[in-house]
Amino acid sequence: MYKTFSMELAGRTLTIETGKLAQLANGSVLVRYGDTVVLSTATASATPREGVDFFPLSVDYEERLYAVGKIPGGFIKREGKPSEKAILTARVIDRPLRPLFPKDLRNDVAIVNTVLSVDQDNSPELAALLGSSIAVSISDIPFNGPVGAVILGLIDGEVIINPTEKQKEISQMYVTLAGTRNKIVMIEAGANEVPDEVMLDAIKKGHEEIKKIVDFIDGIVKEVGKPKFEYESAEVPEEIFNAVREYAYDKMREAVLAVDKQVRDKNIDDLTKEITEHFAEVFPEMEPAIKEAIYKLEKKVVREYILEEGRRVDGRRLDEIRPLSAEVGLLPRVHGSGLFTRGQTQVLSSVTLGAMGDVQILDGIDTEETKRYMHHYNFPGFSVGEAKSSRGPGRREIGHGALAERALEPVIPSEEEFPYTIRVVSEVLMSNGSTSQGSVCGSTLALMDAGVPIKKPVAGISAGLVVDENNPDRFVTFMDIQGIEDFFGDMDFKVAGTKDGITAIQVDIKIDGLTEEIIKQAFELTRKGRLYIIDNVLLKAIPEPRKQMSKYAPKIISTTINPDKIREVIGPGGKMINKIIDETGVKIDINDDGRVYIFSSDIQAGKRARSMIEAIAKDIEPGQVFLGRVIRVTSFGAFVEFLPGKEGLVHISKLDKKRVERVEDIVRVGDQILVKVIEIDKQGRVNLSRKDAMEDEWDK
C-alpha cells in the first residue's frame, strides 16, 4: 500500500514514500529532500552464504547524471564504473549500518541507492543514508536500528544542520554524523582546524537532531514495517568453544604476547594447528567451527589483557605510541618524499608537482569540476606479507586515500600562493594498523620536502576501544591501535589535525554505538598523540617547508595580460599558444582574469615563452617600430609579421623612399625588415611602413 511520511529537517521537508516503487525488494523507499530524490532498496538472500565467516553486506550508491541534467562524456554516453565520490558515499552508508546487523547473520544483504534527482542544496548522500536505514528498518531483514543522520557545518561559531550549497562554501567543517537514539555510530569529517571541544559540542547538537529523525523512522516502521525473518545462526556451538577454551586458554594468553607481528602470527598459526589436530577426533567434520572457536578465544584473550589488566599484547601502556621515526628526501628524482614509520606500520609518500592544466577533471553530479590537490593510497600485498598480485585500488584504498587527502586539504596553499597541481602518492610498505594515519604523516613530510608552503604540519593517529560485553558501561580507550587491536577491538577512531585543531575524522565501530564519554576520551587521546607526533617526529625530521624546490620540479614564470587579449594569445583553434609551446617546450595555463603561468624545467625557455606571450598581448599604437619578418608578397605590397601572431601590410608605396616597380625588388619572403605602425583601421587591420621606419633610423 502506497504511503507517504514527512517531517521538517533543517527547515526543509523530508518526505518518505513507501509501497510504490521496487516492491520486489525486501524493503524500498523513495526519499525526497527538497528536489533531491533517491531510491533506496534493501534485499536479502533467502539462505545463508556457504563457507563464509563474515556478514556478506554490500552497499552501492549509484549516481545517474540525468539527475543533474548531464549527458555522460566520452564515446559510450552512459554511466560506467562508480566515481570516487560514489565509492566514498557507499562506504559512509555502510559504516553506520553494518554494526547493527546481527553478528551471526550470513545471508547476503544488498543495499542499493539510486540517485534520481539532485538540487545541490539538499545532499543526495544524506538522503541515501537515511533511505538505506529506513529501507532496512521496514524490511523483514534482521536489523537493530534504525539509524538517523545529519550533516553538520560550522559558520561563525554556529553549528548548521544540513548546510546548503552556499553555506558549505563558507563552512569551517563538513561532518556526516549518524546515530541511534542513544549512541553515535559513525563520524566522517573534514574540517579547517576545528578545536576538539568545538567538534565535540557540534556532535552533541547533531545527535539531538538525530533523535528526532529516529523517532520519525520508528513511526514509519510501526505503520509499514514487516516482521523480521528467522535465520540460521552462524554462532560457534557452545560445547566446542568451551572445549577449546579449556584446552588452550593459557596457551593463547602466551601466544598473543609479542612485540613483533610476525612472531605473534606464527605463534597463533602454530597453536591453531595444534588445537585443530587435538580436536579432530573429538569433533569430527567440525574444523570450521573449531577454527571459529579459536578466533573467538584469541579475541577474548586480547580484549581481556586490555580491559582487565590495562596492558596490550605488545607490552605497551594504554596511552603509549609505538616507536616512531621519520625521514625526508629519500628519492633523488621525485619532487619530494617522506618516510614515516610507526612500529611495524611504514608509509613512503611522494609528491609530484605539475602545471595547473594537470588538475583532475571531475564528471559527476556535484558542482565541483576540478581538483588541484590529490592524494592516492596504495596497499600492496607484501605490506602484510601476502603473496598476491596488485589489481588496482579497491574501495578501501580509495577511502584511505580520500581520508588523508581531506586531512591535508586545509593546509594546502591557495592557487594564488602556489600555482601548482599537487599529487601525493602514499605507498604502504608495512602494515600493522593505522596506515591511513601513517599516510597523513608521510604526506606532511613529503609536501614539506617538496617545498610546498603548507600552513602547518598535520599528523594523524587513532584511538581504540574495548567494551565489557557483560557491562556496556565498563570500557577502556587506548591510543595508537595496531592491527590485532583493530581486528578484535570495538572502535577505530581516526583523527588528523594540526596543533590548533582537527582537519579530518573517520570513525569505524563494531558495536551498537559510542556514548558521549567514549567520544570525549577518544578526542583527548588523539589530540595528545598528534601533538606528540608533530613536535617530536615530523618537525624534527624537517622543521619547515624547504625554501628551494627540487631541481627536477617544473619552475613557474608568471605574467599578467589584459583579459581582452587572451583570445589573441590563444589564437584561432589554439594556433598561437600551441606554436609557443612547440617552440619553447613549456606548459602554459591562462586564467580568465589574465594571469598566465608558464611551467618549464628550463628557466630560459620559460622566459622566452613569457616574452612571446607579452608581445602578443601588447597594445599596438601608431608610431611604434618593430623588427618584422616578411611572410607573404603580393603585387601591391608585403605582409609582415611584426609580433608573434600579428601581421600588417606594407603597401608598395611605403616600401622605400624612391618609387618601387616590383615588391620583390625590395623584399622577399623571409627577409627581416624594420617597420613602423602607421595606422590601425576600424577593422583592426594594421598598416605598416618600411619607408617611415628607415627615415626614423636615418634621423638618428
UniProtKB/Swiss-Prot annotation:
Mg(2+) binds at residues 486, 492. SMART domains: KH, S1. Disulfide bonds: none annotated. Its cofactor is Mg(2+). One of its GO terms (biological process) is mRNA catabolic process. It is found in: Cytoplasm. It catalyses: RNA(n+1) + phosphate = RNA(n) + a ribonucleoside 5'-diphosphate. Pfam families: KH_1, PNPase, RNase_PH, RNase_PH_C, S1. Its EC number is 2.7.7.8. Residues 554-613 form the KH domain. GO terms for molecular function: 3'-5'-RNA exonuclease activity; magnesium ion binding; polyribonucleotide nucleotidyltransferase activity; RNA binding. NCBIfam families: polynuc_phos, PRK11824.1. Involved in mRNA degradation. Catalyzes the phosphorolysis of single-stranded polyribonucleotides processively in the 3'- to 5'-direction. This is Polyribonucleotide nucleotidyltransferase. It comes from Acetivibrio thermocellus (strain ATCC 27405 / DSM 1237 / JCM 9322 / NBRC 103400 / NCIMB 10682 / NRRL B-4536 / VPI 7372).
